Amino acid sequence: MSQIKDRVEKLIQTNPVMMFSKSFCPYCKKAKATLKELNVEPGICELDEDSEGRAIQDYLKEKTSQNTVPNIFIKGQHVGGCDDLLAAKDNGSLSKMIAAL
C-alpha cells in the first residue's frame, strides 16, 4: 500500500487541483464541467482506466473517509465530491480556493 500511498500523495501535491474520477461517472463529468467553467484544468486520475484504480480508491477511502468519486483536492486539501464542489462554488469559497492557483 505504501507504493499506492506515495503515488496518490505525489499526485495531490504536484497538481494544484487533483480529481480522482471514473470516466463513466455523471458526478465526475459534472465536477469536471464545473471546474472547466472556472478555467481550472485539474489533474485527473481515471480510476476505472488505471490498473491500480481499486487500490487507489481504497487508499483514498482510508485517507478521506470518502469511498465515492469524484474525490477532489485543491492545493493539497480535500474538498470532497461533486456536491461539495458545487456547494463551495455556490457559497463563494471555491473562487477563493482557486484564486491563488
Swiss-Prot record:
Name the cystine pairs: 25-28
Q: What does this protein do?
A: Multifunctional enzyme with glutathione-dependent oxidoreductase, glutathione peroxidase and glutathione S-transferase (GST) activity. The disulfide bond functions as an electron carrier in the glutathione-dependent synthesis of deoxyribonucleotides by the enzyme ribonucleotide reductase. In addition, it is also involved in reducing cytosolic protein- and non-protein-disulfides in a coupled system with glutathione reductase. May play a role in protection against oxidative stress caused by superoxide in vivo by regulating the redox state of the protein sulfhydryl groups.
Q: Which organism is it from?
A: Rhizophagus irregularis (strain DAOM 181602 / DAOM 197198 / MUCL 43194)
Q: Give the main location.
A: cytoplasm
Q: Which GO terms describe its cellular component?
A: cytosol; nucleus
> What keywords sit in the KW lines?
Cytoplasm, Disulfide bond, Electron transport, Redox-active center, Transport
Record's note on what induces expression: Up-regulation of expression first detected at 24 hours after exposure to copper and reaches to a maximum after 7 days. Up-regulation of expression reaches to a maximum at 12 hours after exposure to paraquat and returns to basal levels within 24 hours.
Under what name is this protein listed?
Glutaredoxin-1
Family, per entry: Belongs to the glutaredoxin family.
Q: Where in the cell is it found?
A: Cytoplasm, Cytosol
Which terms does the record give in the GO molecular function aspect?
glutathione disulfide oxidoreductase activity
Q: Where is the Glutaredoxin domain?
A: 5-101
Q: Which InterPro entries match?
A: GLR_AS, Glutaredoxin, Glutaredoxin_euk/vir, Glutaredoxin_subgr, Thioredoxin-like_sf
GO biological process terms, alphabetically, are:
cellular response to oxidative stress
Q: Which Pfam families match?
A: Glutaredoxin
